[in-house]
Amino acid sequence: MSYWSVSDIRTHLRALGANPKHEHRVLRLWSQALPQTQGRRPLESFMPAAVREALPGIEAQLQALATLREQHPGEDGSARLLVGLQDGQSVESVLLPRDGLCVSTQVGCAVGCVFCMTGQGGLVRQVESAEIVAQVALARHRRPVKKVVFMGMGEPAHNLDNVLEAIDLLGTVGNIGHK
């Protein structure tokens, strides 16, 4: 199964017998870049067998949502990350000084602002909610991320449903405060 949205992940977990607490745990560990085996209690004590057995595959699918293709460090402590998506498209995320991350919400852009290179090729597609969260998880494998800004490739307001779903997850189980 390929995940695109956070809702897809929840639906798949429910189909395996997960309840909201199980979903919460899987999504929390993924969005915080922690292994699915981490936790105070052993999985056997509370996670349904079907979910436990599927976890390695689920974890692999979640990690495949966003992969690092290139990293370019900046002199100011920032780092540009070229992020590969499942379908072969790429977006950029930028690790910012002081625990921030700038994420992309579209592959390309339809606006075409004269100062921005992103719009020159036009809009290719929307970045799905799970792919937005995956950019955060990928960055957290490199260093702590406590703040997220939606100022990368694309116009967040033109992809509002996916952006809001990602914000909801990051602001709850993702341990990033809403401001």
Locations of the language-model features?
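Conserved Radical SAM active-site core
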Residues: Q89-V91, L96, L101-V107, V111-K179
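Flexible, acidic/Gly-rich N-terminal and inter-domain linker regions that tether
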Residues: M1-D99
